[in-house]
Regions:
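The feature encodes the CheY-like receiver
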Residues: 14, 56, 84
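Active-site beta3 strand of CheY-like receiver
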Residues: 44-50, 55
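AAA+ ATPase active-site-proximal loops
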Residues: 129-150
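Acidic catalytic/metal-coordinating carboxylates
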Residues: 33, 59-62
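Active-site residues of response regulator receiver
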Residues: 8, 52, 80
Length: 150
């Protein structure tokens, strides 16, 4: 169904979100800080990342840029305990899919993950299709003359 990485330093939130999202059929990975989150992103290549704004080793708003640099097709949803408009605007500018308040409405999180997952899945599929269309074999060919050169 897809992979979701949750980055949050609050163990209860991490556990609750992991359980709820896992019950929907997603494969869930966890991280309690930015450093581990980046490592999990690189190792597991999730389509969707849920990230807390306030982390012990950095800001989730700033982390969005790094996550998008490493995995541009993954979608990042930022979670905050205290939403404010400037952080939300900056998060979107940095490439976040959305910015929501924790506990605001827990019924919003699963549909939001589904939308982000759909967008990421389409992007990954398009990238794969373009890669096949413009691979070495289709652009250069596999004639005996080309085989001799390569």
């Amino acid at each position: 169904m897809g992979k979701v990485l949750i980055i949050d330093d609050e163990k209860q939130i991490l556990s609750l979100l992991s359980r709820i999202i896992g019950l929907e059929g997603y494969e869930v990975f966890q991280a309690a800080n930015c450093k581990v989150g980046i490592k999990q992103l690189e190792q597991n290549d999730p389509e969707v990342v849920l990230c807390d704004v306030c982390l012990p080793d950095g800001s989730g708003v700033e982390l969005v840029s790094e996550l998008k640099r490493l995995r541009p097709l993954s979608e990042v949803i930022l979670l905050t305990a205290h939403g404010n408009i400037p952080d939300g605007v900056q998060a979107i500018k940095n490439g976040a899919f959305d910015y929501i308040t924790k506990g605001d409405d827990n019924n919003k999180i699963l549909p939001l993950i589904a939308k982000a997952m759909e967008k990421a899945t389409v992007a990954y599929s398009q990238q794969k299709a373009v890669g096949k269309q413009y691979s070495f074999d289709t652009v250069i060919g596999r004639s005996p003359a080309i085989e001799a050169v390569s």
